[in-house]
């Protein structure tokens, strides 16, 4: 397949390299304006990819979108007029709501979501480390996307295991619950994920997930608070030494994805008349931090 990766950060670069190794024609669309970008995965041989090449966009069978949620609209909208209407759009990012916000622009395209537990890190612009093996689920956002289940096989051949999940919203909400519990707390307290096992965090994690569960159920997504809590603590223990993406964003004073994580739950709660005081307070704390940097 002809594949373009929009936003080759750590995860996007990981997939670009594995899809290239699986025999696909892969190009990048990065903020960097140079015509080629070289990436190296761990100790493997470096690979050069075409970058910001309009011809690769016009002939793309698949556009893999791995920018951060708050970057989706600005990064994708200028590219849409150059895409064939049969080009599959596959979104792989933290949080929810970014695709909904631009859904009217996407009605003619097959649209897919993916969620992955692979860990990746870019120490430099060109060096990619695969820091943790995981699994990936792919599923449809719209009816055209529902016809594209073969993409799971394409990705599975590149970096297994990958499964097709026709109920991808369930998986996205479960990951959102994990992010709602871990990201704002680790960002505010500037701690590693593992610190959240401390007893003083138990009440707030419980309250966060109770609110998320209520909103999920109003959205007709099945979920039990206890099961979500078990999932959160599994992730905390499995990633104990890790610094969450929001922790890093706050540390480096970068925009966070709070609007598409905690903010998404708060907005959906408002739509359904469900109070989310704990998530709302965390949302405001992160937004206040972001605003303080812009004034500094």
From Swiss-Prot:
Coarse class of the protein's main subcellular location? cytoplasm
Q: What class of enzyme is it?
A: oxidoreductase
What keywords tag this UniProt record? Answer: Cytoplasm, NADP, Oxidoreductase, Pantothenate biosynthesis
Spell out the catalytic residues.
Answer: 175 (proton donor)
- Any signal peptide, and if so, which residues? none
Q: Does the keyword Cytoplasm apply?
A: yes
Single GO molecular function? NADP binding
Query: Which sites bind NADP(+)?
Result: 7-12, 94, 120, 257
Q: Name one GO cellular component term.
A: cytoplasm
Family indicated by similarity:
Belongs to the ketopantoate reductase family.
Functionally, this protein is described as follows: Catalyzes the NADPH-dependent reduction of ketopantoate into pantoic acid.
Q: What name has this protein been given in UniProt? A: 2-dehydropantoate 2-reductase
